[in-house]
Amino acid sequence: MLQITDLVPPVELFGDYVYFSSNSDSWVAHAAACAARYREELNPNHVVEIASNDGYLLRHFADWGISHLGIEPAENIAAVARDSGIETRTEFFSEKLARDLVSERSADLILANNVFAHAPDTNDFVAGLKVLLLAEGHAVMEFPYAVEMIGQGEFDTTYHEHVFYFTLTSLEPLMARHQMRITRVERTPMHGG
């Protein structure tokens, strides 16, 4: 695992965010393919997406009539998601938020695309996953892979939003610490692996 030690407070980075995921055609196509695959393979009843942005991914589940919730800390972007019919809470994901949410409903699928590297407290993040996820559920996370970043010279993925750069060997003990395990690993061409 690699990490940046000079941290910018998350509220400064994400309080009023300017990146809208739906502006990237390649990312939207990737999200659509992933959503279809998750629906086919996992058949979820309730999907929670962490850092759901403008609802680009959850809108597929909404269109299929699948219960969903987006968690997006940037109010300006969360408002766009809500305006398009995506139920969205404007907060940073944490174990505390997960405990609040689980009192209403647990998730059998949690999606976290390009957010885990942003979390300054990975233990709190993973603890939140464990709390919110049903015992037979799945958490799917996409993030830049440190091995690809170094091996392919992808240093353009290094910036203040990304606090951590993970390897599989750094993730396994982190997940185990919270009684979770990695069951599948895939490399994708999106965002550095």
Spans of model-derived segments:
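Glycine-rich phosphate-binding loop signature in dinucleotide/nucleotide-binding domains
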Residues: 42-43, 102-105
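Conserved SAM-binding strand-loop segment of SAM-dependent methyltransferases
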Residues: 85-100
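A conserved beta-strand element that flanks and buttresses the S-adenosyl-L-methionine
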Residues: 108-111
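A short glycine-rich, Lys/Arg-flanked "PGG" loop and its adjoining helix->strand segment in the class I
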Residues: 123-140
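Conserved S-adenosyl-L-methionine
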Residues: 180-190
